[in-house]
């Protein structure tokens, strides 16, 4: 199935049902009080994370989704039926962004997690709601409010602990094949990898972490060169980045210049992503003699002014890959728990929050909801006439 990691859809929640104006009319009760019921709330639109999905391709073909409208209220204090909610299934790792405001509504990072993206319209009020000591026969009602409409950008961000970063043909796909059972395509030409790949690494029995391989970056990717930077978003949730460098590029380019170009593209895309822990990994060490290898590594590190972790490996022969995987796992385990370190989600405001409270306060500050329909009688308000001879 084609990998689609971004889609734009329009969602509309259901409108609320309108209230009803009605009066109780039964045998022996000709002048009953108001009994108009409220309308039903409109259905809302939710996103739910589904483990069986791994692409947003379904939302490329159908882009408009409408929840059910609430029914109108009826007499005898019958409340209208609420509209059914609409649930849209998306892959785990999906982020919902409001296109009009650029507000992030939420991230679905766990199976079964549910996110409200469009709130249904509130029900209208029946005339029963407006009775009071001074208004015994109200003929007021309110209409249901409109359901929210949002244009959403759905972004699928892969959930991985380790992200691979580097130029095309640096050996990223070969490395992920060496340490996991993932089988991305490997060939001796640039941009062999066209979509992100995930692999589960088991460095020791009972231990595992997830690694993500994305298409290679080149200088000018932020301006659209190569495959651009659209796949960098898949590294946003990674806890550590492996910057893989080809120590002996076949085109004779400078590894140090390649490393600087990658860092520059990272900073253009997201300073937060560029600030993540990053390890420098020299690949294809089997192409050099041991003495020459160390000299080359020291020279590149000095040219870059690099002060972080430095590792060497040969992904093709798997030399050094197992040790690197074990160190990665130990480093990930030493990091604080993400749930504890994460900032609490911002409150998302929806259109009709607290709508009726203000409406009732304005229209009827002395609202009394006691059930006194049987005591209502127009005769209470007649003028008493006394006949005299």
Curated annotation (Swiss-Prot):
Respond yes or no to whether keyword Magnesium is given for this record.
yes
**Annotated ranges, domain Obg:** 1-159
- Positions of the OBG-type G domain: 160-333
Q: Name one GO biological process term.
A: ribosome biogenesis
Extract the Pfam families matched here.
GTP1_OBG, MMR_HSR1
Keywords in alphabetical order, please. Cytoplasm, GTP-binding, Hydrolase, Magnesium, Metal-binding, Nucleotide-binding
Q: Which GO terms describe its molecular function?
A: GTP binding; GTPase activity; magnesium ion binding
Query: EC?
Result: 3.6.5.-
Q: Which GO terms describe its cellular component?
A: cytoplasm
Q: Where in the cell is it found?
A: Cytoplasm
Q: Which co-factor is required?
A: Mg(2+)
Which InterPro entries is this protein grouped with? Answer: G_OBG, GTP-bd, GTP-bd_Obg/CgtA, GTP1-OBG_CS, GTP1_OBG_dom, GTP1_OBG_dom_sf, OBG_GTPase, P-loop_NTPase
Question: Which positions bind GTP?
Answer: 166-173, 191-195, 213-216, 283-286, 314-316
Q: Which residues bind Mg(2+)?
A: 173, 193
Q: How does it assemble?
A: Monomer.
- HAMAP family documented for this protein: GTPase_Obg
| Entry's family note | Belongs to the TRAFAC class OBG-HflX-like GTPase superfamily. OBG GTPase family.
The protein's job, in short, is: An essential GTPase which binds GTP, GDP and possibly (p)ppGpp with moderate affinity, with high nucleotide exchange rates and a fairly low GTP hydrolysis rate. Plays a role in control of the cell cycle, stress response, ribosome biogenesis and in those bacteria that undergo differentiation, in morphogenesis control.
What is the name attached to this protein's record? Answer: GTPase Obg
Q: What is the lineage of its organism?
A: Bacteria, Pseudomonadati, Pseudomonadota, Gammaproteobacteria, Alteromonadales
């Amino acid at each position: 199935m084609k990998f689609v990691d971004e889609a734009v859809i329009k969602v509309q929640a259901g409108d609320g049902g309108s209230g009803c104006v009605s009066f109780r009319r039964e045998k022996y009760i000709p002048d009953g009080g108001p009994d108009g019921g409220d309308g039903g709330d409109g259905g809302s639109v939710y996103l739910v994370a589904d483990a069986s999905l791994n692409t947003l391709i379904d939302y490329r073909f159908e882009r408009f989704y409408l929840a059910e409208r609430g029914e109108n209220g009826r007499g005898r204090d019958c409340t209208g039926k609420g509209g059914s909610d609409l649930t849209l299934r998306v892959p785990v790792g999906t982020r919902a962004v409001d296109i009009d405001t650029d507000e992030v509504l939420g991230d679905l990072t766990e199976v079964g997690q549910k996110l409200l993206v469009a709130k249904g319209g509130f029900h209208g009020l029946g005339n029963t709601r407006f009775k009071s000591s001074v208004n015994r026969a109200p003929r007021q009602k309110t209409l249901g409010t409109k359901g929210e409409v949002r244009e959403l950008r759905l972004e699928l961000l892969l959930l991985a602990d380790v992200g691979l970063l580097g130029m095309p043909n640096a050996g990223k796909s070969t490395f992920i094949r060496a340490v996991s059972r993932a089988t991305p395509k490997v060939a001796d030409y640039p941009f062999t990898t066209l979509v992100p790949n995930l692999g589960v690494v088991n460095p020791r029995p009972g231990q595992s972490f997830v690694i993500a391989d994305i298409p290679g970056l080149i200088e000018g990717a932020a301006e659209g060169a190569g495959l651009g930077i659209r796949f960098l978003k898949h590294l946003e949730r990674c806890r550590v980045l492996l910057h893989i460098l080809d120590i002996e590029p076949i085109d004779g380019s400078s590894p140090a210049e390649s490393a600087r170009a990658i860092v520059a593209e990272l900073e253009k895309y997201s300073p937060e992503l560029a600030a993540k822990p990053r390890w420098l990994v020299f690949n294809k060490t089997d192409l050099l003699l041991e003495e020459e290898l160390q000299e080359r590594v020291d020279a590149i590190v000095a040219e870059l002014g690099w002060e972080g972790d430095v590792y060497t490996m040969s992904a093709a022969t798997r030399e050094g890959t197992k040790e690197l995987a074990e160190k990665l796992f130990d480093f990930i385990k030493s990091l604080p728990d993400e749930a504890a370190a994460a900032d609490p989600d911002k409150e998302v405001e929806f259109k009709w929050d607290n709508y009726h409270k203000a409406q009732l306060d304005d229209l009827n500050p002395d609202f009394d909801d006691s059930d006194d329909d049987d005591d209502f009688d127009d005769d209470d308000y007649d003028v008493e006439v006394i006949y005299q001879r």
